[in-house]
Design a protein with these regions (language model features):
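Intrinsically disordered, low-complexity segments enriched in serine/proline and basic residues
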Residues: 12-15
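Basic/hydrophobic alpha-helical interface regions
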Residues: 20-190
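Glycine-biased, low-complexity coil/linker segments
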Residues: 1-6, 17-18
Length: 190
């Protein structure tokens, strides 16, 4: 069936009722555009912010002034990079839903190393909230974690050279979720 002939899209949840509405998809929507729309709507739902602005650009992933910016998705939404992108979106959406910036600023240590550990542990805490309850979110977060650790070089570092903040976050994540570190990251804790 062509667009408008049985194909549907999903709208963000209604803040008043928490419901999702359905509307016809645009005729020319590509799989990448469908993926972007689904990813943005999932981030809004996870963040519990129906009006959350989600942008795609080369400067993502980041959260700034209430705007979630994500990297452009791969052309093939089934590509392994898609799980990483979903994890990046979930990570930031969970931060919006479960992080108190004022409290964090008040409690954050002044010492740089202590502040890095504090920030990493706080991010592990907010991610654990979603990972404990939602298997898909847990899988996405694991994919994003492994990609982030690989890009930072932490997976290739000897145990004594792993950044203390990364190791602390992995330990807190394990404690809060009951899930061992992903296979690629276990050597960081040896």
């Amino acid at each position: 069936a062509g667009a408008g002939q049985g194909e549907v899209g999903v709208a963000p949840p209604s803040p008043a009722r928490g419901m999702v509405y359905v509307w016809p998809m645009a005729a020319a929507e590509t799989p990448a555009e469908t993926f972007k729309r689904a990813l943005a709507n999932a981030a809004r739902a996870l963040a519990e912010q129906a009006e959350l602005e989600v942008h795609f650009g080369s400067d993502g992933p980041r959260l700034s002034n209430g705007v979630l910016t994500l990297p452009h998705p791969p052309r093939d939404p089934g590509a392994p990079e898609s799980a990483t992108l979903r994890g990046q979106a979930d990570r930031l959406a969970l931060r919006l839903a479960n992080h108190d910036e004022r409290l964090n600023a008040r409690l954050r240590p002044v010492d740089q190393t202590a502040a890095e550990v504090f920030d990493a542990v706080e991010q592990a805490r907010v991610e654990a909230v979603g990972a404990r309850e939602l298997k898909g979110v847990r899988n996405n977060l694991n994919a994003a974690l492994l990609t982030r650790l690989e890009k930072s070089g932490a997976l290739r570092a000897e145990a004594e050279r792993v950044p203390v903040a990364e190791a602390a976050a992995l330990l807190v994540r394990e404690r809060l979720t009951g899930e061992a570190a992903p296979d690629g990251a276990k050597t960081m804790l040896d």
